[in-house]
A protein has these predicted regions:
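Extreme N-terminal "head/tail" segments of very large remodeling/mechanoenzyme assemblies
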Residues: 1-77, 82, 87-88
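Extended, charged alpha-helical "arm/stalk" segments used for dimerization and assembly
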Residues: 82-158
Length: 158
């Protein structure tokens, strides 16, 4: 079983890099308005397979990179903005260094495979989509909201 945490996120925008580091356990991102809190969450969402980003075009975001510690081993995922490709460099058994795609295909698996392996969830897991019992594939984006809580959801519950 994998124990993992996001170790860092690096954003390249307007040919400059910004990096935020995380620690194992609960990380809380807080601060005044317009300081980048939502940007961090948007980056994580985008790296977990969001088809589109919510980055302000004026920021000129070019690339997102994320570093993950998996039982002390390194895994990095890189994605150029407005592409469907993810470059994964893995030192983790069971996760291949390769080019992954948003949806996957014959040559490239979907990025969801990396995340599902990290969560130790079988890749072919299905869940019920509708009240009629129609099945759909379980993806990390299906349950993303359970471990990434944004400020809007906190205010909704207050």
């Amino acid at each position: 079983m994998f124990m993992f945490y996001i170790k860092w996120i690096k954003i390249t925008a307007n040919q400059k890099e910004s990096r935020i580091d995380f620690a194992p356990g609960l990380n809380i991102i807080y601060g005044p308005s317009n300081t980048g809190k939502s940007m961090v969450l948007d980056c994580i969402d985008y790296m977990m397979g969001a088809g589109t980003h919510r980055f302000d075009v004026n920021l000129k975001v070019e690339k997102i990179q994320i570093g993950i510690d998996v039982n002390g081993e390194g895994l990095s995922i890189s994605r150029d903005v407005n592409t469907q490709s993810f470059e994964v460099i893995s030192h983790v058994d069971g996760i291949e260094t390769s080019t992954y795609k948003l949806k996957g295909g014959k040559k490239n698996p979907p990025i969801n495979d990396v995340w599902m392996k990290l969560f130790d969830i079988p890749l072919d897991t299905k869940i019920l989509k509708t009240q009629e019992g129609k099945p759909q594939a379980l993806t990390v984006r299906t349950f993303y909201h359970t471990f990434i809580i944004d400020e809007d959801r906190i205010h909704d519950k207050a």
